[in-house]
Amino acid sequence: MRRPMVAGNWKMHGTRASVVELTQGLGNMSLPSGVEVAVFPPSLFVTQVIDGLEGKGINVGAQNSAVQPEQGALTGEVAPSQLAEVGCKYVLVGHSERRQIIGESDEVLNQKFAAAQKSGLTPVLCIGETLAEREAGETLKVVGRQLSSVIDAFGIKAFANAVIAYEPVWAIGTGLTASPQQAQDVHAAIRKQLAAMDAEVAANVQLLYGGSVKAANAAELFGMPDIDGGLIGGASLNADEFGAICRAAGN
């Protein structure tokens, strides 16, 4: 049975003081049993958060890592092996802000996906369509292509050690969110695409929904059969709100 997961993407938010406060708040949360909880702070604060959450049952991930697994001459980047050494468990790959603003291609993201796995990290592959693509009826085509890029490069078994997060680009940071049924329809299509190649991988991979998830709508979203939790943005910056979302996943 798939374990529910709630992941908090802090994006480029936080100061030393606010990260201490948020980490302490998270550490004091009463977490539901059986829910995997992880947070993704800016890389500058990763070790601080790992130390602050030691023994609290919350994993830490990175928002980005380099295309090569090992350290080397790549100015400004962080190797996934370095992240693994300091205690990270996960790394985000392919978030829409990196696809669209930074311009990361499928080829680059595939390199990052493979480097993360080689270093012992679990990649969280982010996929999703823009508003124009949804209005054109191309949601499943776009999401399917983004999935196929990884499958074509590494095979379906690559998703035996990965998490998939469906984040419609039009719902990220906008206050808009897909309806539970809209989200479920896409999640079901993702699982069906995987199942056509490997039923066991499809049945076991965690599929998260992201896009303006809040405590108020989390329970309804997480109640859908193919939605295994959420990748949370703004709401993860408030320990009480994030805790409420985690409890919704536990129910």
UniProtKB/Swiss-Prot annotation:
Q: Which Gene3D superfamilies match?
A: Aldolase class I
Any one GO CC term of this protein is: cytosol
Q: What EC number(s) are associated with this protein in UniProt?
A: 5.3.1.1
The keyword Cytoplasm is annotated on this UniProt entry: yes
Q: Which domain of life is it from?
A: Bacteria
Q: Name one Pfam family in it.
A: TIM
Query: Which keywords appear in this protein's UniProt record, sorted alphabetically?
Result: Cytoplasm, Gluconeogenesis, Glycolysis, Isomerase
Question: Where does it live in the cell?
Answer: Cytoplasm
GO biological process terms, semicolon-separated = gluconeogenesis; glyceraldehyde-3-phosphate biosynthetic process; glycerol catabolic process; glycolytic process
Return the InterPro entries for the record: Aldolase_TIM (IPR013785), TIM_sf (IPR035990), TrioseP_Isoase_bac/euk (IPR022896), Triosephosphate_isomerase (IPR000652), Triosephosphate_isomerase_AS (IPR020861)
Q: How does it assemble?
A: Homodimer.
Give the family from UniProt: Belongs to the triosephosphate isomerase family.
Name the UniProt record assigns to this protein: Triosephosphate isomerase
Q: Which gene encodes it?
A: tpiA
